[in-house]
Regions:
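DPxDG-like acidic metal-binding loop motif
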Residues: 59-95
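Conserved hydrophobic/aromatic positions in well-ordered beta-strands
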Residues: 16, 124-126, 205
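Surface "functional belts" at beta-alpha junctions
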Residues: 22, 89-182, 211-213
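Gly/Ser/Thr-rich beta-alpha loop segments that engage phosphate groups in nucleotides
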Residues: 13, 65-69, 73, 117, ...
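Acyltransferase
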Residues: 175-222
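N-terminal beta-alpha supersecondary unit
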Residues: 1-64
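Residues at secondary-structure transition points
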Residues: 30-38, 69-73, 77, 178-182
Length: 222
């Protein structure tokens, strides 16, 4: 079983090639402004690093959000196209869950988050039990106040993960050190929980409507 894993939900792209759930290669890079221009080449580069090619692939694994709308759409389009043209199964993984896996060995609550602007975040809270991620607070679109109140009212220690923590640190509760950059290779830790989706109908998990959709609704309600 040879897999390519693609994650690029928040200005950072991570691509990994796995064989029988073991990491053969991984490429990580900033991609805030050029994801669509580099992603196909970087997938090829990752496969080359692993000594593989597209014809060796047996499945595609895509991070399907939440995060940057543009990045999520690009990853979805590329992975759906690869799965369809190569006639391969497509699996999806939550970008927040992939972030949480950076602290998979932690005995604290794990709080992955992505800045959603205007004092809001995409976030979830997990804990690890029996080497499995257990959802304590479901992934969703929260105000920072809502997330902070949840953590305040919980007696357990916690740790944040995510590259937006520095930007939001003055608005977050005190927590211990955090890890920032998501790793596509970490999908091996939740591989058995991934489900195959219909590559034609696979939809990114935005968790909220785009600004254009919100403006259109506002115009209709005027």
């Amino acid at each position: 079983m040879v897999s390519i894993v693609v994650e690029a939900s928040n200005g950072f792209c991570s691509i990994a090639c796995l064989e029988n759930n073991k990491v053969l290669s991984q490429r990580n890079m900033e991609c805030s402004n050029n994801l669509s221009a580099i992603i196909l080449q970087e997938i090829d580069n990752c496969l080359n690093d692993a000594g593989k090619s597209k014809k060796d692939l047996t499945e595609i694994i895509a991070s399907n959000g939440p995060g940057s709308y543009t990045a999520i759409r690009v990853v979805a389009a590329i992975c759906k196209t690869l799965a369809y043209t190569l006639k391969l199964p497509l699996k999806v993984a939550s970008s927040l869950k992939l972030q949480a896996l950076l602290e998979f060995e932690s005995n604290k609550l794990i709080v992955p988050l992505i800045d959603a602007r205007r004092n809001n975040v995409f976030a979830a809270v997990y804990k690890v039990e029996n080497k499995k991620l257990i959802e304590v607070l479901q992934e969703d679109y929260y105000s920072l106040e809502e997330l902070n109140n949840f953590l305040k009212n919980n007696d357990e220690q916690f740790v944040y993960v995510g590259r937006d923590i520095k930007k939001l640190k003055e608005k977050l509760l005190l927590a211990e050190n955090n890890k920032n950059e998501v790793s596509a290779a970490n999908v091996v830790k939740i591989y058995d929980s991934l489900e195959i989706v219909d590559s034609y109908n696979m939809k990114p998990q935005y968790l909220r409507k785009t600004e254009a959709e919100r403006e259109l609704e506002n115009d209709k309600n005027k």
